[in-house]
């Protein structure tokens, strides 16, 4: 019973870490990264469609991204969506592909992005702690109802705390890497 609670909590904590990883990948670092465009919606035949469903991405150089639409009639719609986005890139349409050159980040902008990343990391930590709180309540309920012994409950809470620490450490490691990437890029 406690193992089910721990297994579920560990899975949900892992999902929180994965969500943080995804969030971090959407923060610009000055390098061309297709993940920057993962949340960008293009008005394709009047329907908001994720850019990743409309085109393939290549990075021929560190700061250049080539976007090749599967349907060439979508070129202008994709270009318009890129121009209207807050990514800060200037797309160039040559009739076949869209070339996006990522501008260098200023020191001020880098520090702003570091603050954003810290906020996303804190959100992930809170998410992990919430999972821990719910799992701890479930373990306490099992002990209170007499389904498991008090020793097993304490052992389960100790294992839960270890899993929580492990997942928060993973978020901190992701944060450290992203911060180094932002400030060192």
UniProtKB/Swiss-Prot annotation:
Gene Ontology CC annotations of this record: cytoplasm
Summary of the function given for this chain in its UniProt record: Responsible for the release of ribosomes from messenger RNA at the termination of protein biosynthesis. May increase the efficiency of translation by recycling ribosomes from one round of translation to another.
Tree of life domain: Bacteria
S-S bridge residues: none
Single GO molecular function: ribosomal large subunit binding
Protein name from the UniProt record: Ribosome-recycling factor
Protein location: Cytoplasm
Family in the record: Belongs to the RRF family.
Keywords annotated in UniProt: Cytoplasm, Protein biosynthesis
GO biological process: translational termination
Organism, scientific name: Kocuria rhizophila (strain ATCC 9341 / DSM 348 / NBRC 103217 / DC2201)
InterPro entries assigned: Ribosome_recyc_fac (IPR002661), Ribosome_recyc_fac_dom (IPR023584), RRF_sf (IPR036191)
